[in-house]
């Protein structure tokens, strides 16, 4: 109870600082633009859009060598997957030809589609990276971990994919992959096994490549970072001597999901400790380019009452639901095959089956009013799922025909490969 009150006070205080830095006003049809960028900039750094500009000046004062990222990747970037493009756009560090993100870069990458003003990429020597990582082991390991680190961290592309997947999947699959690599049965893995875990979980993450008229370009082979990274130091220490227990890993997953949820809540609530329903609609539709978007916004204007809001707890419960979209989609197939519309009671039951939890009537009523395309008080669930997938994948999702069973089948296959390799290294030759 005391912890909840403390968090509410912290959010309220932070929200107060945000409100003082923002202009009042309501948008009839919200759009992604400079205001949204300014809001989240203030939320992250307390200085709004000036953060990017200030970082460039600070780098110049320190005499650090910088290189322009655009010169290195703008040419072939169209041939990269959506996720690689996003990584390259937001990464701000470079070492030995490889690009890296800071924790702040990662938070920005999941909140925005693009960088409005790309700063120069800072080129680091190995000693510089060691200095950047020096404070990780003493940082608080709660739901403000990435915010507390700010620019004091290094995230590789492999880890970026891994972190994205954590934000879109339930915990159960991670436990399966973790146990498959735990050859000793003590729910603990070493650093080299964690590298395999990242690849396994990221193997089928829904962030597919961009398709062109000619071919489908694949990401280049992901190289292992030649330096320590934030996650490696956090889990295994600077020298990699520690082991990672599943309970600690699960706490990290839960804290990361909570941190991003709180960041997005503050971004779209404009720093308040509640989110207006029209703000919630803006969050839902932020990464969506569906042809029915105008209808959704008409529903927001005509069906949602002024002054109604969504609490932080309600927002978190909805985000928890979105990590179970595959299970929810299976429940919805019953209605699709029967060509039946989905009514409120049926939707509520499907959510409970998929997640084991219930959404509040306030949330359900809001969702139904937004996604009722025909005015029949039923949910257009097919397009609703597409909107949610785009929202949770931050605009990086490409529609594909893959069931949840196929996803975990692939995870199991990759896990078995990791087990075989672990046995070979442990026993000299594998028993398979």
From Swiss-Prot:
Subcellular location: Mitochondrion intermembrane space; Mitochondrion inner membrane
GO cellular component: calcium channel complex; mitochondrial inner membrane; mitochondrial intermembrane space; mitochondrion; uniplex complex
Keywords of the record: Calcium, Disulfide bond, Membrane, Metal-binding, Mitochondrion, Mitochondrion inner membrane, Phosphoprotein, Repeat, Transit peptide
InterPro entries, per the entry: EF-hand-dom_pair, EF_hand_dom, MICU1/2/3
Modified residues (Phosphoserine): 202
Chain positions recorded as Ca(2+) 2 binding sites: 372, 374, 376, 378, 383
Gene Ontology molecular function: calcium channel regulator activity; calcium ion binding; calcium ion sensor activity; protein heterodimerization activity
Residues given in the record as Ca(2+) 1 binding sites: 182, 184, 186, 188, 190, 193
Protein name, per record: Calcium uptake protein 2, mitochondrial
Lineage: Eukaryota, Metazoa, Chordata, Craniata, Vertebrata
Gene of this entry: Micu2
């Amino acid at each position: 109870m005391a912890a909840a009150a403390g968090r509410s006070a912290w959010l309220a205080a932070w929200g107060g600082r945000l409100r003082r830095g923002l202009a009042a006003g309501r948008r009839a049809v919200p759009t992604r633009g400079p205001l949204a960028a300014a809001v989240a900039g203030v939320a992250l750094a307390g200085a709004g859009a000036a953060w990017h500009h200030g970082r460039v000046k600070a780098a110049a004062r320190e005499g650090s060598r910088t290189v322009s990222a655009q010169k290195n990747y703008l040419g072939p970037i169209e041939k990269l997957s959506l996720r690689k493009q996003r990584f390259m756009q937001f990464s701000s560090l470079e070492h030995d030809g490889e690009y890296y993100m800071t924790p702040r870069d990662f938070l920005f990458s999941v909140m925005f589609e693009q960088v409005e003003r790309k700063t120069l990429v800072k080129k680091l020597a190995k000693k510089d990276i060691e200095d950047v990582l020096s404070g990780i082991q003493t940082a608080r390991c709660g739901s403000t971990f990435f915010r507390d680190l700010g620019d004091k961290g290094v995230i590789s592309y492999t880890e970026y994919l891994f972190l994205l997947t954590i934000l879109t999947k339930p915990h159960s699959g991670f436990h399966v992959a973790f146990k498959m690599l735990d050859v000793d049965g003590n729910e603990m893995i070493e650093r080299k096994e964690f590298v395999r875990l990242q690849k396994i979980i990221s193997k089928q993450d829904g962030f597919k490549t961009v398709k062109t008229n000619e071919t489908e370009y694949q990401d280049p082979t992901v190289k292992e970072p030649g330096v320590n990274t934030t996650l490696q130091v956090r889990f295994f220490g600077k020298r990699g001597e520690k082991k990672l227990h599943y309970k600690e890993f699960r706490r990290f997953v839960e804290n990361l999901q909570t941190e991003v949820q709180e960041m997005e809540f503050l971004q779209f609530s404009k720093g308040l400790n509640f989110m207006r329903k029209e703000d919630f609609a803006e969050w839902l539709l932020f990464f969506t380019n569906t042809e029915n978007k105008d209808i959704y916004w008409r529903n927001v204007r005509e069906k949602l009452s002024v002054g109604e809001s969504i609490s932080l707890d309600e927002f978190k419960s909805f985000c928890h639901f979105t990590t179970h979209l595959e299970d929810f989609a299976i429940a919805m197939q019953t209605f699709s095959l029967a060509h039946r519309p989905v009514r409120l009671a049926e939707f509520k039951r499907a959510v409970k089956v998929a997640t084991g939890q219930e959404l509040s009537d306030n949330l359900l009523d809001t969702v139904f009013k937004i996604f009722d395309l025909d005015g029949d008080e039923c949910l257009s669930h097919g397009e609703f799922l597409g909107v949610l997938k785009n929202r949770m994948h931050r605009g990086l999702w490409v529609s594909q025909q893959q069931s949840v069973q196929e996803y975990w089948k692939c995870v199991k296959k990759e896990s078995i490969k990791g087990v075989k390799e672990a046995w070979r290294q442990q026993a000299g030759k594998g028993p398979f």
